[in-house]
Regions:
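Active-site catalytic microenvironments in core metabolic enzymes, especially phosphate/sugar-handling
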Residues: 1-300
């Protein structure tokens, strides 16, 4: 039986873009490209794909250069010859602190910040909606946020089940969830997966559900679950006033969900490449302040 064919930089990039379409206000998709003048994404082979929310020590151990562990701090390049590391492509959601000097030659780093937040966290996430039992063909898109009329920040859909059943599914998906507020009913009919949580968005969700006919005029939000990342005071107060249940999974857990999903899809699409997912916190980069150079103007 023949081995699966190894993908190329171009093939993996195009596949990622089927889930994360480029957006004008997003970070550069090809965030870090090999500087070799002979580099060709159509022929550059990928043996290893590394996925992470941010650049972390674990990421650098996979995309960087070997380190000499015999030195203090293990930060000196090894002087000896070692086996060739795998040809690697990396994806980062928040790449802003990437140390490009530490990226191994030939490695491509892809990125998506806005598009990833929009479709692979708690927002317009149709995959998550389907897993929670929402009828996505009939779902409503919550669109327009912070002056951007095109930005999708949520999905609202019908899903008749108990509150406990929904929370159990959310726990399975994210590995963590908190029932921030239990509304006036333990029977959920509508789920709103939202990437924003404030008074205006809570009222917008209720109004959209009413316009669709899922909630009768004058009825409160007791049969609606608002699923989001972080709890916010204004959003919580508005939800409580409407009798609406609120579940929060945490901002980072929402991002990790997207990384896991990409990993699953990449393994299925490219069995010839090893896929590594890194889940750890980024170490803050402390940049040294430049000290102005002063000249001695005293007479000699």
């Amino acid at each position: 039986m023949s081995r699966p064919k190894k993908p190329t930089h171009a093939a993996v990039t195009q596949f990622v873009e089927t889930f994360l379409p480029p957006k004008e206000n997003d970070v550069q998709r090809l965030y870090h490209t090999p500087r070799n003048p002979r580099y060709d994404p159509e022929t550059a082979v990928v043996e290893q794909i590394v996925l992470s929310v941010t650049p972390t020590p674990g990421v650098y151990s996979l995309i960087g250069y070997p380190l000499d562990e015999s030195t203090i701090g293990a930060t000196t390049l090894l002087p000896r010859i070692y086996p060739r590391p795998p040809r690697t492509l990396c994806f980062l959601h928040r790449p802003f602190q990437l140390d490009r000097r530490s990226v191994r030659k030939g490695t491509l780093v892809l990125s998506s910040h806005t598009s990833f937040d929009e479709v692979l966290t708690v927002g317009w996430n149709t995959v998550l909606a389907e897993r929670l039992g929402m009828a996505t063909a009939d779902c409503l898109c919550v669109q327009g946020y912070k002056g951007d009329p095109e930005r999708k920040i949520g999905i609202i859909g019908w899903a008749s089940k108990s509150l406990d059943a929904v929370l159990s599914q959310v726990q399975d998906e994210f590995g963590a969830s908190e029932l921030a507020y239990e509304g006036s009913s333990d029977e959920i009919r509508i789920i709103a997966i939202m990437n924003a949580f404030n008074e205006d968005e809570v009222h917008r969700v209720l109004a959209m559900a009413q316009e669709r006919g899922w909630i009768m005029e004058g009825e409160d939000g007791g049969h609606l679950l608002y699923l989001t990342g972080q709890p916010r005071v204004s959003g919580m107060e508005a939800a409580k006033a409407l009798g609406m249940s609120v579940a929060c999974v945490g901002h980072r857990q929402g991002e990790d969900w997207g990384i896991r999903f990409l990993g699953q899809e990449l393994r299925k699409a490219f069995p010839g490449a090893r896929v590594e997912e890194v889940y750890e916190e980024e170490i803050p980069v402390v940049r040294e302040k430049k000290v102005p150079v002063t000249q001695d103007t005293a007479p000699q």
